[in-house]
Each structure stands twice: as C-alpha cells, then as structure tokens.
C-alpha cells in the first residue's frame, strides 16, 4: 500500500475538518480541490484533471466520486473512503447524488468548495439541479485553512522538497554557459531534482533566456543561452 502519512495523522486531519464543519453548521461537505482530497485520503496521482469530488459526512465513511478507470489506483492508495466510479459518458452529478443519498445528506446543509479550479460551472449546476432539498453552503476555505498549520512530519517533507529544489537549482546554474540550450539546462535541473527524491513536478521548471525573461509561465523552447544573457 502506498502511504506517506500514518493512519493516526489522517484520522486527526479528518477530526479537525469535522470540527470545522460543526462550526460552519453543515452536515457534510463536498471537496473539489485535489490538494484537499489528498490531505484527507492520500490519493496521489495525475488523474485529478478530471472530476474528483470527495463527500465528507459529519460521521461515517467518506465517499470519493471520480472516473471508474481510477479504481485500481484508489484501491492501492486509499483506505478510509469508498469509491463511486463513473464512466466517461455518464454525468458525475448522478454519482454525487448517490453518495449524498447513501450518507443521508439529501435533506441537509452541505458545504461545497465553490472557489475551485476543478469544479466546472456545468457540474456545479447539474449537482444543484439534482439536489433540490439540499441547502448548499460555500465552504471553500474550510480544509485549506487547516492545511496552513503543518505537522512535524509535514515539515520534514517540506524540508526534503526544499533540498530537491536546491539540487535542481544548483544543477541548472552549473550547466548554463555560452552556447548551452535551455533543453540541456532543463534536463540537468530535472535530473538533479528527481535524483534528490523529487516526485513529478507540480510546476515548471521555468528556465528562460533574456528574450523571454518577462514571460511568467513558459518553459524550455530549444533556445540557446548567450554570453551576457539575463536568465530566469
């Protein structure tokens, strides 16, 4: 089983979330932010670009709604929630309704993370239309606020991530010279970070010559560094 944090830490996180749910006076919440889903379940993969919604009741087992093809990943990684998998030609909202029904939340006050890049307007409208008796509340910051305070084990991982980042930065700096391509530099940066224990990168790396210095979010393009270049 893939695991980073012990069961006790995950249990404490869930207790903290439920405490905040009580303060918000909601009977359940629907989590749509991938980082928040990971925070409670440890589901760690790249399928989060598609629908992922975690239903958290005030008591009882959580339910994750996502694509059916993610079942094996879910079973390998998640031990504290149930899996409701939908086919790609089905409306995920129907599975959210089933999850809410299973957890007896169809006549309740339920929070949802509205301020999420991963909840489309179409899906939100479909969920709302199919749950006329649910009183929906915006709980966008409920879980995110708890994540700000790190546990000792989380801090250890932050330090490990910083060391991997340092390794990548130093490798990039050392590989830059007149005539080097940003392909070479980016490859050395990535190699060093992965060798230092990094998993897949959340962003970047961003390595740019003078000609693209002001482009905030562009990566390597096959350009060649020249003597005197300012480099990001």
What annotation goes with each model-predicted range?
Residues 9, 14, 20, 91-201:
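Flexible, acidic/His-enriched mid-domain "rim/lid" segments that flank
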Residues 1-98, 163, 167, 221-223:
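N-terminal accessory/capping or targeting/presequence segment of soluble
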Residues 64, 83, 136, 206-207:
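Generic preference for hydrophobic
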Residues 37-48, 140-145, 149, 180-232:
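Short catalytic-site patches enriched in acidic/histidine residues
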Residues 56-61, 132, 209-211, 226:
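Short acidic-glycine loop/turn motifs at beta-strand connectors
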Residues 34, 114-116, 210-212:
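Acidic, glycine-rich active-site loops and adjacent beta-strand->loop/helix elements
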Residues 27, 108, 229:
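Conserved acidic residues
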């Amino acid at each position: 089983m893939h695991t980073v944090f012990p069961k006790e830490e995950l249990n404490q996180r869930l207790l903290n979330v439920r405490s905040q749910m009580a303060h918000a006076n909601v009977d359940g919440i629907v989590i749509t932010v991938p980082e928040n889903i990971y925070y409670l379940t440890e589901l760690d993969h790249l399928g989060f670009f598609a629908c992922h919604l975690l239903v958290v009741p005030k008591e009882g087992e959580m339910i994750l709604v996502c694509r059916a093809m993610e079942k094996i990943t879910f079973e390998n990684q998640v031990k504290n929630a149930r899996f409701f998998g939908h086919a790609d030609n089905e409306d995920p909202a129907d599975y959210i309704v089933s999850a809410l029904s299973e957890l007896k939340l169809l006549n309740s006050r339920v929070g949802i993370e509205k301020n999420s890049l991963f909840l489309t307007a179409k899906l939100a409208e479909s969920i709302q239309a199919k749950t006329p008796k649910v009183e929906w509340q915006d709980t966008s910051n409920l879980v995110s606020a708890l994540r700000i305070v790190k546990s000792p084990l989380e801090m250890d991982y932050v330090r490990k991530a910083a060391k991997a980042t340092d390794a990548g930065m130093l490798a990039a700096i050392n590989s830059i010279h007149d005539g080097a391509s940003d392909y070479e530099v980016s490859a050395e940066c990535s190699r060093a970070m992965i060798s230092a224990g990094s998993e897949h990168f959340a962003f970047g790396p961003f390595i740019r010559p003078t000609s693209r210095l002001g482009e905030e979010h562009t990566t390597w393009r096959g350009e060649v560094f020249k003597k005197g270049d300012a480099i990001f």
